[in-house]
Amino acid sequence: MFWTKKNFDVYGEQGGISTAITLPEGFNTASDRCPMVILMHGFMANKKFHPIPTLAKALAKAGIASISFDFNAHGKSEGKFIDMTIANEISDAKAVFEYVKTLPYVTEIGFAGHSQGGVIAGMLAGELEDDPRKPACMVLLAPAAVLK
């Protein structure tokens, strides 16, 4: 198996955020270093919904770690769907980003988002323009809309 997952919770405004880290085969978090991509799913989906697992596996094969997560009120994350907004999804993604910045084995951070996750990735990247660890790259897969 070329990838492994480690589950844990990051906390956002709406509660616990269910996450999974996918690492390249044989990767040692104590001694190895690599970039990490934050994978963001679309509306009404979750971290197990296509294309997120496919992307995580492909990145791991290429020697790149990834972290996928369920936005609030999706999958195994806390929160009520009626309370989910673009603003608190951006907050969820930022909480994951802040967590990734603390991982000593991560050299660079990238974003990849599908559908509404693409919108969130783009909007968060704009907010992080002055952050020294801002995303080194970003891929938007069928972003849902343009929001101002």
Model-assigned labels for residue ranges:
Residues M1-S31:
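N-terminal cap/lid segment of alpha/beta-hydrolase-fold proteins
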Residues A56-E78:
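Conserved alpha/beta-hydrolase
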